[in-house]
UniProtKB/Swiss-Prot annotation:
It comes from Shewanella oneidensis (strain ATCC 700550 / JCM 31522 / CIP 106686 / LMG 19005 / NCIMB 14063 / MR-1). Residues 1-85 form the YcgL domain. Coiled coil: none annotated. The lineage of its organism: Bacteria, Pseudomonadati, Pseudomonadota, Gammaproteobacteria, Alteromonadales. SUPFAM superfamilies: YcgL-like. Gene3D superfamilies: YcgL domain. It comes from the Bacteria. Signal peptide: none annotated. PANTHER family: PROTEIN YCGL. This is YcgL domain-containing protein SO_2575. It holds the Pfam family YcgL. InterPro entries: YcgL-like_sf, YcgL_dom.
Amino acid sequence: MLCAVYKSSRKADTYLFVNKRDCFDDVPQALLDMFGVPQLVMVFPIVKRESLGIADINKVRAALEEKGFYLQIPPPQVNLLAEHRENLGIKD
């Protein structure tokens, strides 16, 4: 099975995986509206991959089979200042 990966034109480091290139039939319209114009990054055979960047390959495969798409959002940014203040015992 091939998988097409698109990056968002509106949200940084946000990617949409779909089963077929340029086929967004299974993706909710509200998600597409927030995602912006999908920009193709790559197409690859997902069955031959053992890992992906930050996404769990098993979750991606399962989502593609069940929902027809997988949305990868960036991990939350760590607030180093807040963490440092907490370690020092400083409260707001």
